[in-house]
Amino acid sequence: MKIREWILAVCCLAGAHATAAAERANVEFLDSGKVLPAGLPFSEAVRVGDVVYLSGQVGIVPGTLKLVPGGIREESRQAMENIRATLEAHGLAMSDLARCTVMLADIGEWTAFNDVYTTFFVGRYPARSAFGAKGLALGARVEVECIAAARD
């Protein structure tokens, strides 16, 4: 390999590395302390450019790892309130949600979840999918994770 070709290859690799590092610099890890207790091994949300990825929320009392009592409806309501609180802590609203994924310990509780979920939106709903899942965190009946479009 000629020296000129070798130098060109090194410069290209250095440029690619610098570009990748700059792209990584746009990742922002968000933790407000308003919903999740400190010390968990994940961020409550991560912003990459104009997209905010929210970690899954279960129906915990904010600041604790204790599920609210009352079953699927109360857990669903609290999970959605936790999503709203997380969004608001980072300057966003429920209307900024683009997609939600719902995991239910018992897919037969879909209707009960949906009755609560629909009260959190006016007119338009995010794209959504749902599935049954065994072994949700903390023994929860429902977990909801969402993706939001950030406003500038």
Residue ranges and their predicted role:
Residues I3-E81, A85-A98, L104-D152:
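N-terminal presequence-like segments and the immediate start of the first folded domain
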